[in-house]
Amino acid sequence: MATKFPKFSQDLAQDPTTRRIWYGIATAHDFETHDGMTEENLYQKIFASHFGHLAIIFLWTSGTLFHVAWQGNFEQWIKDPLNVRPIAHAIWDPHFGQGAIDAFTQAGASNPVNIAYSGVYHWFYTIGMTTNADLYQGAVFLLILSSLFLFAGWLHLQPKFRPSLAWFKDAESRLNHHLAGLFGVSSLAWTGHLVHVAIPESRGVHVGWDNFLSVKPHPAGLMPFFTGNWGVYAQNPDTAGHVFGTSQGAGTAILTFLGGFHPQTESLWLTDIAHHHLAIAVLFIIAGHMYRTKFGIGHSIKEILNAHQPPSGKLGAGHKGLYDTVNNSLHFQLGLALASLGVITSLVAQHMYSLPSYAFIAKDYTTQAALYTHHQYIAGFLMVGAFAHGAIFFVRDYDPEANKDNVLYRMLEHKEALISHLSWVSLFLGFHTLGLYVHNDVVVAFGTPEKQILIEPVFAQFVQAASGKALYGFDVLLSNADSIASNASAAYLPGWLDAINSGSNSLFLNIGPGDFLVHHAIALGLHTTTLILVKGALDARGSKLMPDKKDFGYSFPCDGPGRGGTCDISAWDAFYLAMFWMLNTLGWLTFYWHWKHLGIWQGNVAQFNENSTYLMGWFRDYLWANSAQLINGYNPYGVNNLSVWAWMFLFGHLVWATGFMFLISWRGYWQELIETIVWAHERTPLANIVRWKDKPVALSIVQARLVGLAHFTVGYVLTYAAFLIASTSGKFG
């Protein structure tokens, strides 16, 4: 007899109901719980899957390069990046009538195409690609790399090539290799690419496989490097009149500290970027030689952590026991990795628009909006995931004895203080921010807008002034030419001050009362999300109601007071609730960013400044006013090139609303409905010929919440993505 799904759990495979299928899918990646799983096998499986993951990333990027080269207009775009719209790929759709074919035949193409809003054209151009042949070569290279990684993944699952558990637990060696190899050497290699290929290409000098060994990146060659005269590499930078991609106004410097932006491309100077990556390479290569391996030299992390005990004794055992706790818990490691990656992804969103590094991307407004929103959403998901795995760590991996009186133990001991302070901050922010918005709404509605409570963000303006912004007249630090800070920063300051005080970029935007209010609304969202996540993680293992939940697991439902009241203590439910708050916060954040920038890009900053201080302003002048083109994507008179976004806007709402069907209903209702349908099916001629082996049962509470949340999330993202892209591209192309 064929074994039933899931093969990894005999217990589930023998379940006579449809629960078998859903629980099988839900636990497919929970390797720890699979039958016969050993710790060594667990590590080996996860290790091998990393190669598969990387293979997919390389394949995906290869596909992007290939489609741009095959169906895009890269070579035409390079000639006029500010006016030619980049093509992502062609569209072949049997549903298209003549109207749609005409509407989507755009950007100089002879057939329907999609416009690229990912910024890849700007990236390809900045790093030295100038022809379709370059793109094809990149695609083939990544395809080969992808195959190699797939093979490596398979190879590391073979008995002969499976690393041992001891190899996985050797944290110091792994850290050295990852610091020096992954970050250090790859940053050095990227510096090499920028210096040898990208910078010459930006100056009109072609460097390819045919001549890369004979073209010197700098006229002085390696002599200054070996003689210690490194300053030569910073002399004669590109001038302010440099035309990107040509020798006009080009210099010879390769590693500079100019500060600010290239006047024509409005992106960071490539020579500054190369210098930055070289500095990172040096730092990380040194860092990768710090830790003790089998050679017995260097620091032992375990010794360092165990020695971290405050001499006063007031903070207990300090970091004692943490090395083994972290090293033996994959969930702890994953939580740390997700938190770090979440923060860095949010920083990427922030810096991609404020300090754009790719040529001409600052003037591709739809791409800027899409990239900011994309990276902030990803950051949100990663951060929630960090806390989810932190909670699973407490349930599955935390050993109170091994962590007696250390910082982890003490965090749990005073968790009430942490949770209550977060609660207080959330309540304070919520009531005061909403109070101000609602007050302003009421007085505007009654025709007395002058009675609004408008608060200038003076502290934030002071911080901007300290960084060099002259507008507010604070005359402090970098905005004061005679200050210590200004004298110390003389090398890069002229370029930086030009950039920060220019009205044409997004670096340190002018802020007022509308920004003050929405900043606090976003702070409310962040603190409430954090409150739910921190409480969920700290109460995951035990709370007043259930002192130790180790055997109860992570994903049990919050079931209300009727069945024992587990809402206080379900870590899964905290994660579930936090997802809604995270999405809510991202809504406020991206609305703010987009509306503020629409005003700047259209030369009408007053629209945001005057209407963002009360709620109706947000609903009417941001959401409603900007969805006009979207709702008109197709109408009785025909179709335009926003129709796909108009359709997605509708479809996104539908998916989002479907989520509530799963979220606001009783499980018993579904069970009755299912049994009624089964009863009718079994008594209907012809239909009753078809039978199934599993007895249909309603989804469990946790499953229904997950399905509801998935619909809510996907619908929410689809709806806003369509709105963002259509409302921006409808105005600026």
From Swiss-Prot:
Residue positions binding chlorophyll a B1: H653
InterPro entries found in the cross-reference section: PSI_PsaA/B, PSI_PsaA/B_CS, PSI_PsaA/B_sf, PSI_PsaB
Membrane topology: Multi-pass membrane protein
GO process annotations (BP): photosynthesis
Pfam families for this protein: PsaA_PsaB
Top-rank taxon, per record: Bacteria
Disulphide bond pairs: none
Residues reported to bind [4Fe-4S] cluster: C558, C567
Top-rank EC class of the record's enzyme: oxidoreductase
Enzyme Commission (EC) number: 1.97.1.12
Catalytic activity: reduced [plastocyanin] + hnu + oxidized [2Fe-2S]-[ferredoxin] = oxidized [plastocyanin] + reduced [2Fe-2S]-[ferredoxin]
Compartments (UniProt record): Cellular thylakoid membrane
Keywords attached to this entry: 4Fe-4S, Chlorophyll, Chromophore, Electron transport, Iron, Iron-sulfur, Magnesium, Membrane, Metal-binding, Oxidoreductase, Photosynthesis, Photosystem I, Thylakoid, Transmembrane, Transmembrane helix, Transport
Amino-acid positions noted as binding phylloquinone in the UniProt annotation, renumbered to this chain: W670
PANTHER family (UniProt xref): OUTER MEMBRANE PROTEIN, OMPA-RELATED, PHOTOSYSTEM I P700 CHLOROPHYLL A APOPROTEIN A1-RELATED
Assembly and interaction partners: The PsaA/B heterodimer binds the P700 chlorophyll special pair and subsequent electron acceptors. PSI consists of a core antenna complex that captures photons, and an electron transfer chain that converts photonic excitation into a charge separation. The cyanobacterial PSI reaction center is composed of one copy each of PsaA,B,C,D,E,F,I,J,K,L,M and X, and forms trimeric complexes.
Name of the protein this chain belongs to: Photosystem I P700 chlorophyll a apoprotein A2
Natural source organism: Picosynechococcus sp. (strain ATCC 27264 / PCC 7002 / PR-6)
Gene designation: psaB
